[in-house]
From Swiss-Prot:
This is Succinate dehydrogenase [ubiquinone] cytochrome b small subunit, mitochondrial. GO terms for biological process: cellular respiration; mitochondrial electron transport, succinate to ubiquinone; tricarboxylic acid cycle. The gene is SDH4. Belongs to the CybS family. It comes from Saccharomyces cerevisiae (strain ATCC 204508 / S288c) (Baker's yeast). Heme binds at residue 109. A ubiquinone binds at residue 120.
Length: 181
């Protein structure tokens, strides 16, 4: 006797075939790895020494702990009112406010990328590539700081740059609309 599809759940018959269930059960879990970076060989379970050795905690570093968290929150909270002020004003911000906004935004980006590198390119797994990533982050931040200096001294700053890009796109759109008429 053939039952309609909606009635199969009442009879206790399987709706899914066994092959489908096996396919779900046979998938292997794979940890996140970066395909183009070589990894260091790891001991099983990440245990150094023997399992009976006492745990040796890493040395405390407040810059990577509580101070890091406080600085991250200070950067985030200082950027929000400055970004709001920059959006609400019609002209460019003062040089001091724009410089402070740019440096705080750069500091916040630095700390967040630092956290990403620490989490996903760990020194234990990737070895020297962790240090290379940190050097590249520092170099990129220094170049960005120089770029902020050039924007502040030669133009209206970062906020002026964003506003000029926004205005130019509005002018381009209005010119396209007028050209269609």
């Amino acid at each position: 006797m053939m039952l309609p599809r909606s009635m199969k759940f009442m009879t206790g018959r399987r709706i899914f075939h066994t092959a489908t269930v096996r396919a779900f059960q046979s998938t292997a879990k794979k940890s996140l790895t970066i395909p183009f970076l070589p990894v260091l060989p790891q001991k099983p379970g990440g245990v150094r020494g023997t399992p009976n050795d006492a745990y040796v905690p890493p040395p405390e570093n407040k810059l990577e702990g509580s101070y890091h968290w406080y600085m991250e929150k200070i950067f985030a909270l200082s950027v929000v009112p400055l970004a709001t002020t920059a959006m609400l004003t019609t002209g460019p911000l003062s040089t001091a406010a724009d410089s402070f906004f740019s440096v705080m935004l750069l500091g916040y980006c630095y700390m967040e990328f630092n956290s990403c590198i620490t989490d996903y390119i760990s020194e234990r797994v990737y070895g020297v590539w962790h240090k290379y990533a940190m050097y590249m982050l520092g170099l990129g931040s220094a170049v960005s700081l120089f770029g902020i200096y050039k924007l502040e001294t030669e133009n209206d700053g970062v906020v002026g740059l964003v506003k000029s890009l926004w205005d130019s796109s509005e002018k381009d759109n209005s010119q396209k609309i007028e050209a269609k008429k």
